[in-house]
Structure formats: structure tokens, C-alpha cells
Amino acid sequence: MTTGLPSQTQVIELLGGEFARAGYEIEDVVIDHRARPPRITVVADGDTTLDLDTIAVLSRSASSLLDSLDNIGDSYVLEVSSPGIDRPLTSEKHFRRARGPKVELTLADGSQLTGRIGALQSGSLDLVVRAGREWKVREIPLAEVEKAVVQVEFSPPNPAELELATTGRAAGTEVEA
């Protein structure tokens, strides 16, 4: 049985330009033919946070473009969303966009580090880590990062730690390679 839904590639080709004009790129498209009504999920990300107002605008544009297809069918659910906090950071752009949050890294040697994402430069990530009572920046080559997951925080970060992550400098800090 066919639902008349477009393929993942067709959705990306159809919506990609509209999302790019808004400053976002399509990270993934999931088409669930088994759901009733069928569901098309578009996951987008950009250098600025995908807020609810932007999601609404993108959803209206995407819905209009999808509805213009001849074979789309009468009923489907469209969902436009961001990747979510639990998405692993897998590319340089993910780290660049995630500057500031706390992250747990697993390195190629099996060691684990938890720190705050700082600047990304020349294939390396600045990670703000605790060094006794102070904060320091540790430079981590991206090639050594096996896994990186942003951590959910329930309390505000230390101001000095956050300043170091977002500006790259704070009083009483040093950079370690």
C-alpha cells in the first residue's frame, strides 16, 4: 500500500532552500508510513537556536510546499523540530553551535572528560574543566573525540566557568594543551 508520501530525499530537496533562507539546515527527515495519519518529521539546526516562533514559521512554509505536491495525499502530520539536547555532537558544526553547555566527552583512549564547550579552532575544541578551585581551558583535538553528549543542567553554571567558555578568557585561568 502506498501513502503518496514523498521520499526523504524529495523532502530535503523540496524544503532545503526554504530552511536555508531562514538560516537553518535540515539534519534529518523521518517518514513514518505506519502511523495514522502518516508522519513526516523534519529535524533542523542552525547557528541560532530554533525557537518556537521559528518552528511555527518553518512548519507553515514546509506544510505549504508539501501540500503543493500532486501525490501527497489528504492527511499527514508534519513535525518540525530541533535535534534535541540528547543528540550526540558528531561534527565540527555541532560543537560550534553548542558553545557554552556542559558536555561529556569520551576520547579515543577511552578516557572521559566533563567540561563546558568553548571555542572551536583549527580542528580542536576548547573544553573548560575544573582544576582544583580554578577553571582552565583544555584543548582537545576533535579527531580524539569518540563521543560527545551535551549534559542537562538543573542549576546555573559558575559565572567564571561560563565566561571562560563563551569569551575564551576569565581572570585566573590558563590554557592547557
Curated annotation (Swiss-Prot):
<dbReference type="Pfam" id="PF17384">
    <property type="entry name" value="DUF150_C"/>
</dbReference>
<comment type="function">
    <text>Required for maturation of 30S ribosomal subunits.</text>
</comment>
<dbReference type="Pfam" id="PF02576">
    <property type="entry name" value="RimP_N"/>
</dbReference>
<dbReference type="GO" id="GO:0006412">
    <property type="term" value="P:translation"/>
</dbReference>
<dbReference type="GO" id="GO:0000028">
    <property type="term" value="P:ribosomal small subunit assembly"/>
</dbReference>
<dbReference type="InterPro" id="IPR035956">
    <property type="entry name" value="RimP_N_sf"/>
</dbReference>
<keyword id="KW-0963">Cytoplasm</keyword>
<protein>
    <recommendedName>
        <fullName>Ribosome maturation factor RimP</fullName>
    </recommendedName>
</protein>
<comment type="similarity">
    <text>Belongs to the RimP family.</text>
</comment>
<dbReference type="InterPro" id="IPR028998">
    <property type="entry name" value="RimP_C"/>
</dbReference>
<dbReference type="InterPro" id="IPR028989">
    <property type="entry name" value="RimP_N"/>
</dbReference>
<dbReference type="InterPro" id="IPR003728">
    <property type="entry name" value="Ribosome_maturation_RimP"/>
</dbReference>
<dbReference type="InterPro" id="IPR036847">
    <property type="entry name" value="RimP_C_sf"/>
</dbReference>
<keyword id="KW-0690">Ribosome biogenesis</keyword>
<dbReference type="GO" id="GO:0005829">
    <property type="term" value="C:cytosol"/>
</dbReference>
